[in-house]
């Protein structure tokens, strides 16, 4: 699997490499371009994502603690572990960078009693999450912002960010970690869930443009574990307290998404998506699933603390 994936990737990179790099450079995540990059993927419509995601609408890896868990149970196990790593209490004010559709913000407020401020660049997700908190009766405890993470203000007790760092871009990773430090009080904890590239592949990957960056997530970039650790050491006072790898869980999550997408295709097609879109998304699911199975990419939960 890994050898085949590598050949596919090398072939793709050689095809139009200079043009692809130029296009990727123009999509770098400035404040203005970041909003466009997010909209290109996440504003395809909330109804579209509801067809293949779990009941809570989480678009990130689940954590399966046994073979019998379904997708929704795995997603809730993921949220529980993140909140437990942060040791959330009712007195905490939690900052979430990357709202998604509001599942984690709702979960933390409901089950741990904390206040939550969460931010997104997607207008579709902002509208959905705001309405979600109102339906849940949590509008007084959860604030949903339409705001770039670099423009956040204030100080928080805990910080969480789930698979948002991949949308930051390599150039802006130092600013991302500095922002996380600036928004956390001294002694505060941060929990990140991040898709990572193998350390050994990081240098070559950072000089190329892959299928995901070109067609699925414009402006996207996967960090490596070593790169994140070095950036935190160089630019912040964060100390890593826990690192938990769950790569095989992402392969299983993607298999669920692929199956649900295929099963719901007739309904998805009615939303205005064509056969090319169907093939591209099935390739995207399969491409990523193969990467996680081959362990060329993985996903980790990283917990760090300001000292």
Name the predicted role of every residue range.
Residues 150-159:
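A short acidic, Gly/Pro-enriched loop at the edge of an enzyme's catalytic core
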Residues 1-51:
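N-terminal auxiliary segments of SAM/dcSAM-dependent transferases
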């Amino acid at each position: 699997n890994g050898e085949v994936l590598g050949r596919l990737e090398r072939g793709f990179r050689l095809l139009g490499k200079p043009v692809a790099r130029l296009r990727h450079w123009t999509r770098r995540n400035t404040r203005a371009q970041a909003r466009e990059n997010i909209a290109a993927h996440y504003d395809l419509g909330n109804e579209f994502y509801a067809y293949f995601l779990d009941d809570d609408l989480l678009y990130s890896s689940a954590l399966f603690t046994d073979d019998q868990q379904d997708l929704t149970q795995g997603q809730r196990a993921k949220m529980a572990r993140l909140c437990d790593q942060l040791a959330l209490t009712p007195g905490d004010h939690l900052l979430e960078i990357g709202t998604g559709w509001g599942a984690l913000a709702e979960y933390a407020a409901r089950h741990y009693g904390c206040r939550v401020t969460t931010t997104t660049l997607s207008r579709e997700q902002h509208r959905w999450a705001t309405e979600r908190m109102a339906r849940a009766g949590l509008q007084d405890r959860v604030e949903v912002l339409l705001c770039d993470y670099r423009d956040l203000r204030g100080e928080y007790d805990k910080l969480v960010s789930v698979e948002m760092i991949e949308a930051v871009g390599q150039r802006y990773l130092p600013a991302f970690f500095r922002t996380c430090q600036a928004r956390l009080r001294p002694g505060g904890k941060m929990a990140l869930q991040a898709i990572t590239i193998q350390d050994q592949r990081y240098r070559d990957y950072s000089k190329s443009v892959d299928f995901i960056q070109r067609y699925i997530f414009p402006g996207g970039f996967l960090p490596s574990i070593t790169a994140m650790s070095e950036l935190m050491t160089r630019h912040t006072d964060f100390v890593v307290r826990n690192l938990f790898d769950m790569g095989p869980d992402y392969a299983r999550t993607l298999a669920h998404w692929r199956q649900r997408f295929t099963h719901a295709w007739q309904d998805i097609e009615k939303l205005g998506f064509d056969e090319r879109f169907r093939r591209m998304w099935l390739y995207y699911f399969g491409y990523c699933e193969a990467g996680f199975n081959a362990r060329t990419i993985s996903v980790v939960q990283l917990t760090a603390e300001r000292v």
